[in-house]
Swiss-Prot record:
It catalyses: Cleavage of non-reducing alpha-(1->3)-N-acetylgalactosamine residues from human blood group A and AB mucin glycoproteins, Forssman hapten and blood group A lacto series glycolipids. Its EC number is 3.2.1.49. Belongs to the Gfo/Idh/MocA family. Glycosyl hydrolase 109 subfamily. This is Alpha-N-acetylgalactosaminidase. InterPro entries: Gfo/Idh/MocA-like_OxRdtase_N, Gfo/Idh/MocA_oxidrdct_glycsds, Glyco_hydro_109_C, NAD(P)-bd_dom_sf. Keywords: Glycosidase, Hydrolase, NAD.
Length: 425
């Protein structure tokens, strides 16, 4: 609930941090990869690690020692993360745990004077989204969701093109998370599966789109959401569930507990969103169908079109009936290459790092903190993109009725016209 003295944090900036002191909560598959990435980033110091499974903590500490870094303090147990957040020598806490613990950990961290970087989605309910917003506004701490797809080179190029008016007026965008994860959902943690199978458990209990941010984040940036426009309402529809059951029958037998289990989450979810200014957004989610990976990333405007999947495609007036190919496509991608790609992305290639968009995201986050700049993604992005999880489920369960999307800025979106991720300064 908003207090009388509480104001928005659009454009929030803090004094520069010469050295950014980091702590990590969660050292499973994603957490360890994040930790290893930050060994490549200048201007950071890893102060503390927290992991509920002590074996994972020991392995993570060993990674740092073998890389020539001082061993950070370790915390474990159910409340270890709280003790770590209560320290006064940490600037930024990374939260790389299961979905359901993201918000309480972020809120506690901000209440103890820490900036937070949260794995996606940042929250699972609208109530949790409001908790993040209210806490960030009251504490004046940064709260960034680690939506790495916003730093994809093609996404950044189309963002740059949109900001320069190349597509004309944007009328419609599309995003998705289509990724066959059946083997991971059923795998033990030792074989790359989720801790305690939390991903599969969510599929049993919920429907809608539980993971909207990979597709939604980049296209919301193109539409300048909460910086001159905002998402108004959505309608959502899910197909029947068949993929999980079919996979379980094939791999565990028709009479296995896995095959007999009932799953509420439909195989394909499609959510349509309209903005206050009349722009339309389509977001899809499917992780149980044998098909190629896709995030779609479609941009439609009055002067042109772009789409990343299944193959990168750009078409512009006056010859928009045919997409640019070969050298012509390369030239337009080079002409509108985003500054982040030109600097941090080039550095990632030079150093032969495995995931360019992660590296660009990491570098940009630390760059902003060390230079006292607003972050590229704020708490309102985290709330707006994450709230689709609960709201899409509400729509699906009620015959695809329209569901209103809250204005987490409480009207400040009308006053703010900041062009995000357009400069390095």
């Amino acid at each position: 609930m908003k207090t009388p003295s509480q104001t928005h944090v659009l454009g929030l900036a803090h004094p520069p941090l010469p050295m950014v002191r980091l702590a990590f909560i969660g050292l499973g598959n994603r957490g360890v990869l994040t930790l290893q990435r930050y060994l490549q980033i200048e201007g950071v110091e890893i102060k503390a690690l927290c992991e509920i499974r002590e074996g994972n903590l020991v392995k993570a500490q060993k990674i740092l020692r073998e890389a020539g870094y001082p061993q950070p303090d370790g915390y474990t147990g159910p409340d270890g993360w709280k003790r770590m957040c209560e320290r006064d020598d940490i600037d930024l806490v990374f939260i790389c745990t299961d979905w359901l613990t993201h918000t309480p950990m972020a809120v506690y961290s901000m209440e103890h004077g820490k900036h937070v970087a949260i794995e996606v989605p940042a929250a699972m309910t609208v109530e949790e989204c409001w908790k993040l917003v209210d806490t960030a506004e009251k504490t004046r701490q940064h709260c960034m969701m680690l939506e790495n797809c916003c730093y994809d080179p093609f996404a950044l190029t189309t963002l740059n093109m949109a900001q320069q008016g190349v597509f004309g007026e944007i009328t419609h965008v599309e995003g998705a998370y289509i990724h066959d994860l059946r083997s991971i959902y059923f795998a033990d943690e030792s074989k790359g599966g989720f801790h305690n199978h939390w991903g599969k458990k969510y599929s049993i209990e919920h429907t809608g789109n539980p993971y909207p941010t990979h597709g939604l984040g980049p296209v919301c940036q193109i539409l300048n959401i909460h910086r001159g426009d905002r998402m108004n309402y959505l309608v959502s529809l899910s197909s029947l569930q068949a993929g999980m059951t079919e996979y379980a029958r094939k791999n565990f037998g028709a009479d296995s507990p896995e095959a007999r289990q009932k799953y509420l989450l439909g195989d394909m979810n499609t959510t349509l969103i309209q903005t206050v200014k009349g722009k339309s957004i389509m977001i899809q989610y499917n992780v149980v169908t044998p098909r190629p990976y896709s995030r779609l990333h479609t941009v439609c405007g009055t002067k042109g079109f772009a789409q990343k999947y299944p193959v990168p495609s750009i078409a512009l007036e006056p010859d928009a009936g045919s997409p640019l190919e070969g050298k012509a496509l390369e030239e337009i991608m080079e002409r509108y290459k985003h500054p982040f790609t030109a600097t941090f992305g080039t550095e990632a290639h030079r150093r032969n790092l495995p995931n360019e968009m992660n590296y660009v995201m990491d570098c940009r986050l630390i760059y902003c903190l060390r230079n006292g700049l607003p972050l590229d993604m704020d708490v309102y992005d985290a709330a707006e993109w994450s709230c689709i999880t609960e709201l899409s489920e509400q729509s699906v369960l009620n015959g695809s009725i329209p569901v209103e999307i809250p204005d987490f800025t409480r009207g400040a979106w009308k006053k703010c016209h900041i062009s995000r991720t357009s400069d390095l300064y």
